[in-house]
Amino acid sequence: MPRVKGGTVTRARRKKVLKLAKGYRGSKHVQFKAASTQLFVSYKYAFRDRKKRKSEFRRLWIARINAAARQNGLSYSKMMHGLKLAGVDMNRKMLADIAYNDEKTFAALAETAKKALA
């Protein structure tokens, strides 16, 4: 009897890898070795970028707050310091959302910060 090397187990494993590599360019979605190598790299990128996403959102929020604060005659750092002195306990995500969606409320917050700085 001939020897069966792996058989269904190997086929299932390779099929699983190629299914995960669906949508990759070139031979990376066809050839098992190229696909498994690319999957390894893709998982590394995914892990790294899950961590990076947090700082990228923080940068976006700060940019939005800064732009809105400058329209109201303050810099970002003075705005944040003024809000802290005034006892306004809002995080950057909330402030950025207000700056983006509700200009009147943000202007009121900017006035509060200005009064606290004076």
Curated annotation (Swiss-Prot):
Task: Give the protein's recorded name.
Answer: Large ribosomal subunit protein bL20
Q: Which family does it belong to?
A: Belongs to the bacterial ribosomal protein bL20 family.
Please give the superkingdom of this protein's source. Answer: Bacteria
Concerning InterPro entries, the annotation shows: Ribosomal_bL20, RIBOSOMAL_L20_CS, Ribosomal_protein_bL20_C
User: What GO molecular function annotations does the UniProt record carry, in alphabetical order?
Assistant: rRNA binding; structural constituent of ribosome
Write out the GO cellular component annotations. ribonucleoprotein complex; ribosome
Protein task:
Binds directly to 23S ribosomal RNA and is necessary for the in vitro assembly process of the 50S ribosomal subunit. It is not involved in the protein synthesizing functions of that subunit.
* Signal peptide segment: none
